[in-house]
Amino acid sequence: MRRTVGAVWCAAILAASVGIGAVTTGSGTASAASASRASDGSEERARTRSLLGRWAHYDVVAYQDGLLKTLIVSYGFNDFTRSGGEIIDSAQFCFAEQRTNQPIETSLSDAATQAITPPSTPVETDVVDGRLRVRRPATPTPVGIELRDPATESLPTDPADPRVVDDDGDGKPGITVTIRVTPELTGELYIARREIFAYEAFLEGKNRLVGTVTDGSEQLVIGASDPIFLGSGAHWEQYPDLTKSPILLRRVGRGWDCDRLKAERDRLFPPTPEVDW
């Protein structure tokens, strides 16, 4: 339809008026969105500050190979500190338990567990569905071996490899896993590992972080007390159902140490799980 000049002029004024209104409304919307983002950011910063301090650590990693299903339950601490605007997670391991689906007992000494010393690393934080989420990235950590590049350097296969170290101080290469099949049949495996784990956890209340662990660790057997054990435990893969690999952190005092954690383990954490898949 042809418009007259007057109609066009009126339409232009109307459009300008609507445009001015839209700009004003858009500015209000933008301001509201900006305020919402600022509020979300303030909430995240406040919740992130609440992470600071020492947390007791419990995690389970479910592994399986062709013959054996295994749970490794680890205990320790995570210390969250602030540095340069980032939250840094410093992890420490204290002791561990193992469970299998076979009549075989395997164990790792506290010294071997404490030899696992992941590097401190920044964690990622955000708010998901109103809950603070904390994500620690994988930090490849050698144990029983010294690696210049922990992320890519190959693991040894020879116990005489000069990179192999006695990290648990028992006079054997690598770290020692004790195996008990029967009272008469016991022995040791000497292994080197590259610990590669990451976690995602959500803050529940003020004093609990709950989530799951993702593990891509590598392990090689570099010796045994008896050749019969040499085929044991060379290749493990994490069971894909991550609900079998939970992590739980509980806030504790800064003065807590491994001895106190062991003494109060049952008060803080659920019973040790069994292989059930």
What label would you give each PLM region?
Residues V18-R37:
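Signal peptide processing junction and immediate N-terminal pro/mature segment
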Residues D40-G76, E86-E97, P103, R136, ...:
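Tryptophan-anchored aromatic micro-motifs
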